[in-house]
Amino acid sequence: MTGLMVTDITNIAKEYNLTAFSEDVYPCNKNYELTNGQLSALKTINVVLTTRSDNYEKDVTYNDDDDHDRCIVSEIGSHHSFNDEKDNYIQSNNIQQTPSLSAVFDDNKRVHLLEQEIAELRKKKTKSKNLLDFTNTLFNKNPLRIGILNKRAIILNYASMNNSPLTMEDLEACEDEEIENMYISIKQYHEVHKKKLIVTNIISILISVIEQLLVRIGFDEIKGLSKEVTSTIIDLEIGEDCEQLATKMGVANNPVINISLFILKIFIRRINIL
């Protein structure tokens, strides 16, 4: 009895061993995970279906001599029913045995497919030229409302002003922290630029006053010097020095001071105050 039980247990265990059953028409020739017991059951079903089909052909041949029309009508109906059952069984069997996505592709393959899909979607997106033009117009005409503009749009506008090829698609690949750092850098640059502009205007005014003083004394050759020394030349020659001077003096970025110095610079160049 003990030997019989051990043999039965061994046979049962063998029924649950996995087999390598594959189908050539299945994508990537993936294997079905079937046990020996399941494979034996499928073979038995195949034998039964083949036997029933053979018996049907024999019955049709035998009944042809007695009542051909009646047999054909009745047997055709049963044959269609039998075929329908067979098709339904095969379809349901295929559906149940279809492996999941995790079984077909590993994690690296799925990540690669997702990256390809994202790249294709980005190619289909419209270019940001219209947005860049609109932002440029809005930025230049409404400087007081710069705070409500999108940070990415401000970065694009700054890149456009400096003739740097940059699009919204390039910024979408950046993280929020990187966008924040670029925005802060641009904001700090504008603050320093405004402070440096105050020192530049003061230098232009001093040059105009000194020019008029020297012309009044008798140095006519110096006339027109203030027109030659433009803000661009000052920024190119001593721009960094003006920036350091503005920082050390603690010059504040005051719009009133900027406007006043700008107007004073224009009038001094046109009017002889000495």
From Swiss-Prot:
The protein's UniProt keywords, in alphabetical order, are: Coiled coil, Host cytoplasm, Late protein, Phosphoprotein
Keyword set includes Phosphoprotein:
yes
Residues in a coiled coil are: 106-136
Q: Name one GO cellular component term.
A: host cell cytoplasm
- Fetch the InterPro entries from UniProt: Poxvirus_A11 (IPR007755)
Q: What induces it?
A: Expressed in the late phase of the viral replicative cycle.
Q: Which domain of life is it from?
A: Viruses
Per UniProt, subcellular location reads as: Host cytoplasm
Q: How is it modified after translation?
A: Phosphorylated by a F10-independent mechanism.
Function per UniProt: Required for viral crescent formation early during virus morphogenesis.
Q: How does it assemble?
A: Homomultimer. Interacts with A32.
Q: Which family does it belong to?
A: Belongs to the poxviridae A11 family.
Q: What is this protein called?
A: Protein A11 homolog
Source species, please? Fowlpox virus (strain NVSL)
